[in-house]
């Protein structure tokens, strides 16, 4: 099997998105070596990093915020390669992992000595569709994991300056950060989600980053939080709170590859409309609405309308 086939055949049952990426990187490294990597998941709507998976020994922990800021503030691939060259990186392979439903992440492999050969690049060329699908399906699987026991997510705020230095963290935000990216060593968690939305805000202010500075971050089980950055004079406030019904439904629809019409039907069903009311609202036949609902059940692997709505809402 070639590398893409090996990745497609990977048993993902029971794997978290982080464990999945670790397994995928292991298969890739067995065929194509690299000195460092960044394998990030992003919000499919905004493209902002939500879950980094990185081994970058050439970046000191204290320099991480500056590197993240420069990733968003560089307007071209050439400029980003200049940033990497300053870190001692001599060659890269970059993959944007996106489909018609959004941008799910990216993978960068870095080398600090010999460059990637044409043969190695050929081995990697077929990976983006496979990796894209795997990340999208990893998001979809989160909606089927029950919360046990259910825990309420407290809203919280992190204050940072323009250099991405944390100035204060509320207790609710601190607990949310622990769930987003638990530290592997004693000490506070790295506020990666905050760094990324703040970097996006700063780049947006400079006219470089096109989208709004917010993203949905997985907290474990079926829980999703929304993280937003907002300017407050010489500080930037990052708010963390439960994703709204609309935000969850959008992510649910993207992850399950729903069509625009199926997404409309889901939205109306989530707001309590029955089949007849949905048909009237969309000015379509009752039988057509039933067909859309059946397609929703099939695409989301739901056994009933109740289960479909519970998964989309997080119940």
Language-model segment annotations:
Residues 153-215:
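PAS-family sensory domains
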Residues 196-245:
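PAS-family sensory/regulatory modules and their coupling/dimerization elements
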Residues 1-129, 133, 137, 211-213:
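Regulatory input/activation interfaces that engage signals or partners
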Residues 135-151, 286:
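Short alpha-helical interdomain "coupling" segment at the junction between an upstream regulatory sensor module
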Residues 259, 272-307:
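Recognition helix of helix-turn-helix DNA-binding domains
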Residues 261-265:
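The N-cap/first-turn positions of alpha helices
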Residues 146-150, 242-260:
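Regulatory hinge/linker segments at domain boundaries
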Residues 305-315:
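Short, basic, alpha-helical segments at the C-terminal edge of helix-turn-helix-like DNA-binding modules
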């Amino acid at each position: 099997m070639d590398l893409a086939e090996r990745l497609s055949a990977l048993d993902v049952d029971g794997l978290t998105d982080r464990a999945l990426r670790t397994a995928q990187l292991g298969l890739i490294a067995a065929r194509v070596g690299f000195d460092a990597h960044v394998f990030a998941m992003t919000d499919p709507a905004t493209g902002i990093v939500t879950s980094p998976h990185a081994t970058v020994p050439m970046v000191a922990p204290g320099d991480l915020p500056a590197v993240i800021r420069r990733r968003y503030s560089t307007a071209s691939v050439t400029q980003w390669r200049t940033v990497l060259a300053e870190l001692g990186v001599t060659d890269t392979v970059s993959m944007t992992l996106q489909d018609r439903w959004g941008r799910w992440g990216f993978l960068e492999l870095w080398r600090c000595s010999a460059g990637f050969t044409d043969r190695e690049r050929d081995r990697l060329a077929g990976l983006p569709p496979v990796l894209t699908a795997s990340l999208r399906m990893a998001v979809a699987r989160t909606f089927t994991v029950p919360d046990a026991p259910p825990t309420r997510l407290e809203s919280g705020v992190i204050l940072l300056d323009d250099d991405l230095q944390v100035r204060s963290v509320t207790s609710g935000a601190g607990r949310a950060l622990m769930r987003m990216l638990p530290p592997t060593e004693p000490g506070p968690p790295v506020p990666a989600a905050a760094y990324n939305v703040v970097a996006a805000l700063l780049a947006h202010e400079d006219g470089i980053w096109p989208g709004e500075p917010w993203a949905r971050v997985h907290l474990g089980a079926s829980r999703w939080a929304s993280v937003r950055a907002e300017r407050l004079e010489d500080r930037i406030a990052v708010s963390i709170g439960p994703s709204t019904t609309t935000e969850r439904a959008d992510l649910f629809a993207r992850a399950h590859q729903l069509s625009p019409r199926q997404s409309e039907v889901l939205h109306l069903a989530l707001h309590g409309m029955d089949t007849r009311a949905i048909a009237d609202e969309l000015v379509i036949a009752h039988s057509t609405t039933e067909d859309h609902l059946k397609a929703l059940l099939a695409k989301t692997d739901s056994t009933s309308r109740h289960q479909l709505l519970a998964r989309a809402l997080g119940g």
